[in-house]
């Protein structure tokens, strides 16, 4: 029997969401994504502590920020030895509301990759889908630096990213699901709100349909999954980035996977484009409590993990 993972790969580009690059080869993903939380998790494992220690040792007299950049590139370079495609490396979440500094940081990361012999076509710079992050992406894309827009929870964010010419977006399925489940509390009905009715799945389907209806080239990569059901319901999405735990479950499963999303079979097609000038963007995002709260929370979590990573580095000096 063909595994669920192999079936999924017939319809969707499978991406591994991890800093634990030793797990990559067995799943044969095309691309890989990282974020501050995943890098922090990886460097605390015995297998990866030597990378952290060597990076600190080699740059002991440099700033902590300087060392973190080189640590990100060290992980990205190792990942690119294993996968044929692209790796996503994230700009510090503390720059999420500063377009200029985000652009500057992206330039630094690209220069470090190029100095390591990695072509920029194999790199996606991850930026938070704030107004400022999207403006940074617009500038970077014009310079030939491809961007992956993360912490995306709403159609207005997706529309703004597409208008800015972003290479790729990462709508967060699981975190959307988490919010609605928490809001419902004891009234949550998993049977009613799971599968195709999962609010995170529905959000990605809506964004995918919007993009394909209006001919945007920006890639849609579902992210932040909690279950294999969420993944299977989005078979046919341009890309899906999946944790090693869920990749293993798909690998071990013989469940039949059928295509659920296709540009040739769009349902509930929108008739108008979303207004995305700055005032409209901010109002629409503010008007959607889930998106506003999860974006803010996501930035806080990634920023906090960046601080934890800094403390690990300081302890090794």
From Swiss-Prot:
It is found in: Cytoplasm. It comes from the Bacteria. Pathway: Carbohydrate degradation; pentose phosphate pathway; D-glyceraldehyde 3-phosphate and beta-D-fructose 6-phosphate from D-ribose 5-phosphate and D-xylulose 5-phosphate (non-oxidative stage): step 2/3. GO terms for biological process: carbohydrate metabolic process; pentose-phosphate shunt. One of its GO terms (cellular component) is cytoplasm. It catalyses: D-sedoheptulose 7-phosphate + D-glyceraldehyde 3-phosphate = D-erythrose 4-phosphate + beta-D-fructose 6-phosphate. Its EC number is 2.2.1.2. The keyword ATP-binding does not apply. One of its GO terms (molecular function) is transaldolase activity. It is an enzyme of class 2 (transferase). Keywords: Cytoplasm, Pentose shunt, Schiff base, Transferase. The keyword Cytoplasm applies. NCBIfam families: PRK12346.1 (NF009001), talAB (TIGR00874). Transaldolase is important for the balance of metabolites in the pentose-phosphate pathway. Belongs to the transaldolase family. Type 1 subfamily. Homodimer. This is Transaldolase. It comes from Burkholderia multivorans (strain ATCC 17616 / 249). The gene is tal.
């Amino acid at each position: 029997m063909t595994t669920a993972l192999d079936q999924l790969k017939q319809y969707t580009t499978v991406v591994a969401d991890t800093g634990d690059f030793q797990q990559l080869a067995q799943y044969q993903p095309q691309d890989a994504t990282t974020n501050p939380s995943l890098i922090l998790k990886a460097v605390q494992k015995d297998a990866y502590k030597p990378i952290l220690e060597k990076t600190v040792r080699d740059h002991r007299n440099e700033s902590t920020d300087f060392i973190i950049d080189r640590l990100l590139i060290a992980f990205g370079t190792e990942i690119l030895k294993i996968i044929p495609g692209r790796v996503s490396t994230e700009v510090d979440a503390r720059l999420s509301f500063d377009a200029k500094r985000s652009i500057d940081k992206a330039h630094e990361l690209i220069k470090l990759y190029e100095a390591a012999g990695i072509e920029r076509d194999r790199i996606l710079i991850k930026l938070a889908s704030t107004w400022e992050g999207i403006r940074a992406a617009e500038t970077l894309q014009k310079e030939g630096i491809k961007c992956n827009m993360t912490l995306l929870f709403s159609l207005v964010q997706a529309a703004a990213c597409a208008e800015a010419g972003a290479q790729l977006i990462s709508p967060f399925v699981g975190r959307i699901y988490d919010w609605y489940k928490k809001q419902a509390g004891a009234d949550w009905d998993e049977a009613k709100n799971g599968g195709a009715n999962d609010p995170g799945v529905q959000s990605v389907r809506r964004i995918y349909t919007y993009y394909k209806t209006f001919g945007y080239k920006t890639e849609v990569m579902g992210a932040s999954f909690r279950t294999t059901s969420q993944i299977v319901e989005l078979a046919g999405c341009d890309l899906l980035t999946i944790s090693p735990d869920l990749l293993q479950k798909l690998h071990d499963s013989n469940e039949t996977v059928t295509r659920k999303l296709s540009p040739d079979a769009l349902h509930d097609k929108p008739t108008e484009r979303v207004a995305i000038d700055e005032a409209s963007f901010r109002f629409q995002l503010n008007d959607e409590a889930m998106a506003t709260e999860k974006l803010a929370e996501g930035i806080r979590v990634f920023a906090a993990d960046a601080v934890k990573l800094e403390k690990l580095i300081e302890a090794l000096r």
